[in-house]
Amino acid sequence: MMIYSCGDVDFLLQNLDEKDLVFSHHSKKRIGQRLINKAFVKNMLFNFDPIEILPGDFANAFKLFYPSQFNPRKELVVVIAVNEINVVVKSLWEN
């Protein structure tokens, strides 16, 4: 299993293809609960550089920070897991 760094994730996001992006079941629940628009999240991942990329709580997991969809004083936090095939959105929330 390849171990990715924050720099690797930045490069992967720049070259991400829509078929390689997967939303986990848990993230879909959060989208509904928090009224976060899936299209907004996809737009951020495909078209904007994250404000910051931090390592997540387990190997190949990362926290990406983007501007909030609803509140300019908050950030959208997107937790992803990366493997050789996909980028999986595990969870998201506004901070």
Predicted features along the sequence, with ranges:
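Ribonuclease/tRNase effector modules and their secretory precursors
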Residues: 1-95
